[in-house]
Each structure stands twice: as C-alpha cells, then as structure tokens.
A protein has these predicted regions:
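Conserved ABC ATPase "signature" region
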Residues: 35, 39-62
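ABC transporter nucleotide-binding domain
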Residues: 108-199
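Conserved catalytic motifs of ABC-family nucleotide-binding domains
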Residues: 87
Length: 242
C-alpha cells in the first residue's frame, strides 16, 4: 500500500478521476486533448497512445472535431479515454452518465465492464439504480453515513423488506391512505403500479389487510427491487444538515 501523505504523487499517477462535468479543453480537438493528457502524465509516444485510445473508444473519424462540439455521450467517452490513458490501477467516476441518453449510457457501461475485466478497479458514484445493479459490490451512503454494502443480492436480502405490488384504480388515494400507517415503511409509485413495503412482515400485512379485498385493486407479493431498498433506507436516514 501507499501512505497518502508520503506517497501522494505516486498515488496520483495510479488513480484516474472523471468528473461529473466535462473538464477537458473545449477548444482543443479530440486528438489534441488526448495527446495533452498523455504528455502531462509522461506517457511514452503520446501520439500513438492517443491514436490507440481513439480507436478503442470508437472515436475514429472524430479525431479533429473540437471537444466542445461533441454531444454529451461522446464527451463522456472522450473523458473516459483521457482518465484511463495513463493506465491507472484505480478509476474514480463521479456520476459519469448524468444527462446522457440511454444508448450512450449502455455503451459507456460496456466499456467500464471491459476495463474491469482487464483488472482495473472502478469506483462509481451514481443515483441510477440500474447502474448500481451493474456493479460487483455496492454501498449506500447518506449524509456521510454508510447504510448498507455488499453485493446487490446481499443488500436486498439484508433489508428484510416484504413488498407488495398493487395495480388497479385510484392508486394515488391508496398511497395517501397507507403512508404513515404502522408497519408500512415505504409507499412508492412505479409506473402504473404501487410498491408497498415494510420490514416487519406481520405489521405490514395487518396494515394492508383492510385494503386487500377493495374492489378494483390487485395485490401481489413481489421481490423487493434495489430501488425499493434504496427508498426505504433513505426514509430512515437522518438528515444531519437540518
């Protein structure tokens, strides 16, 4: 390991960091940005390294395009190329796909998985649960406190949530009636359905019993999703900024 005070410079050379906001030079081309980063880190043959990265990330044909003229998805791809150009051992990504379209998000994550398969350790912050599910391990942090960690399956299992999915008529009124009842820890709309969850199964079932036979409603026991767990954990988190 490295001492963060004594070995700060050595650590920096082994860590790649991609900011949420695009931070490369808007008035330089794709190639110029990558060559600049390569020279900054002392990479041998900066031109060759930039050329290889352009090919890897599918940026061929855009080499001379100004970075500021790229779409959000292409900018993120360029930023990923820049922070992995020096071959770091650890890659830090701060909400890397915020504001990026679904297709670009999927392509970006495919590249992240390819890098991880090559041995790169990647630490990602994200508020998209579908992205969290792509990770080997996850951690929930709220207001500076670690609420849960482990694999996705571990985190869901440890939550001990019992969840019902409700479909039918006037779900908004049902949500208002159930919110705050003893045993009901979470009520959240999901598309055309409602998720009702609680950690105490007996208390939850007692709370929803009067509504189970209500005309126009269909109740089904379901496995809690990662988003169910996230919402429930956040509802219990103490806001220490208030």
């Amino acid at each position: 390991g490295y001492d963060i005070r004594r070995d700060a410079d050595r650590i920096k050379r082994r860590v790649g960091y991609m900011t949420q906001r695009f931070s490369l030079y808007q008035d330089l081309s794709v190639r110029e940005n990558l060559e600049f980063v390569a020279r900054l880190y002392g990479v041998r043959d900066p031109r060759g390294a930039a050329r290889d990265m352009i090919k890897r990330l599918g940026l061929t044909g855009r080499e001379e395009q100004l970075a500021g003229e790229l779409s959000g998805g292409w900018k993120q791809r360029l930023a990923l190329g820049a922070c992995t150009l020096p071959n770091p051992q650890l890659l830090l990504l701060d909400e890397p796909t915020a504001g990026v379209d679904p297709k670009a998000r999927r392509e970006f994550w495919n590249e992240i998985h390819a890098l991880a398969a090559e041995g790169l350790t990647v630490l990602v912050s994200t508020h998209y649960m579908d992205e969290a599910e792509r990770c080997h391990e996850i951690a929930y942090i709220a207001y500076g406190h670690l609420l849960a960690h482990g694999t996705v399956d571990d985190v869901i299992a440890k939550s001990a949530l019992t969840t019902y999915t409700v479909t039918g008529d006037d779900l908004n009124a049902l949500a208002i009636e159930l919110t705050g009842k003893p045993g009901v820890d979470m009520v959240a709309p999901f598309g055309t359905s409602l998720h009702v969850s609680g950690r105490d199964k007996s208390a939850l079932e007692a709370a929803i019993a009067p509504y189970r036979d209500r005309q126009g409603l269909h109740w089904q026991h379901s496995e809690p999703s990662l988003e169910d767990v996230f919402i429930e954990l956040m509802s219990r988190a103490k806001d220490n900024f208030q």
